[in-house]
Curated annotation (Swiss-Prot):
Catalysed conversion reaction: L-methionine + ATP + H2O = S-adenosyl-L-methionine + phosphate + diphosphate
Primary location group: cytoplasm
InterPro entries: ADOMET_SYNTHASE_CS (IPR022631), S-AdoMet_synt_C (IPR022630), S-AdoMet_synt_central (IPR022629), S-AdoMet_synthetase (IPR002133), S-AdoMet_synthetase_sfam (IPR022636)
Species for this entry: Petroselinum crispum (Parsley)
Gene that specifies this protein: SMS-1
Protein name listed in UniProt: S-adenosylmethionine synthase 1
Enzyme Commission no: 2.5.1.6
Lineage: Eukaryota, Viridiplantae, Streptophyta, Embryophyta, Tracheophyta
Annotated metabolic or biological route of this protein: Amino-acid biosynthesis; S-adenosyl-L-methionine biosynthesis; S-adenosyl-L-methionine from L-methionine: step 1/1
Distribution of this protein across tissues and organs: Mainly in floral buds and roots.
Induction of its expression: By fungal elicitor.
GO cellular component, one term: cytoplasm
């Protein structure tokens, strides 16, 4: 947004977080390490880069209570980073499917999103299970959850739908699965309709090319909208 005029487009961030396993739910305790490598112009010093990154990037993003005197900061640890992008590297990777989703914390089926319209379950299937899992947690059915779905080409109904709450469910997983199947339609055509994925054409997905597909507050990210799930609380 122009706050750091020396910033350039290329870069990478990585945050290492320590968690505590609380009966299946993973609770963040502290940030162990923050790595930021960012391209910059020729006028700025490494000390200025480090100071700006702490003030304008880390401070607004990482809650203060997760940082302590033992938190390690690697800010442009390789030194000068003036030349970036395809000018600086040959053989760049394709779209990073793990960064697009859950950063290695959640499971991934292996299919990339980029270049695919909502008729491809690599994209739409990932979106509907995101909404389902998020709704399970938001409804108080579990503190942690994964929803898995599998398909065969040319077969509208999914081959399988699977729910695992890692022992955090308030009711058995099989009962949660029943609620999920009653609430969500996992057929690709119905996913597009129910999540309104064709609104605005495929250009709508340009926003997903950076900053990930999940955890975003944007009206176009319809899969982030929680659906209320009805269940009998003990």
């Amino acid at each position: 947004n122009g706050t750091c005029a020396w910033l350039r487009p290329d870069g990478k961030t990585q945050v290492t977080v320590e968690y505590q396993n609380d009966h299946g739910a993973m609770v963040p305790i502290r940030v162990h390490t923050i790595l930021i490598s960012t391209q910059h112009d020729e006028t700025v010093t490494n000390d200025e880069i480090a100071a700006d990154l702490k003030e304008h990037v880390i401070k607004p993003v990482v809650p203060e209570n997760y940082l302590d005197e033992k938190t390690i900061f690697h800010l442009n640890p390789s030194g000068r980073f003036v030349i970036g992008g395809p000018h600086g590297d040959a053989g760049l990777t394709g779209r990073k499917i793990i960064i697009d989703t859950y950063g290695g914390w959640g499971a991934h089926g292996g299919g990339a999103f980029s270049g695919k319209d909502p008729t491809k379950v690599d994209r739409s299937g990932a979106y509907i299970v995101r909404q389902a899992a998020k709704s399970i947690v938001a409804s108080g059915l579990a503190r942690r959850c994964i929803v898995q779905v599998s398909y065969a080409i040319g077969v509208p109904e999914p081959l399988s739908v699977f729910v695992d709450t890692y022992g955090t469910g308030k009711i058995p997983d099989r009962e949660i699965l029943k609620i999920v199947k009653e609430t969500f339609d996992f057929r690709p055509g119905m996913i597009s309709i129910n999540l309104d994925l064709k609104r605005g054409g495929n250009g709508r997905f340009l926003k997903t090319a950076a900053y990930g597909h999940f955890g975003r507050e944007d009206p176009d990210f319809t899969w982030e909208v929680v659906k209320p799930l009805k269940w009998e609380k003990a």
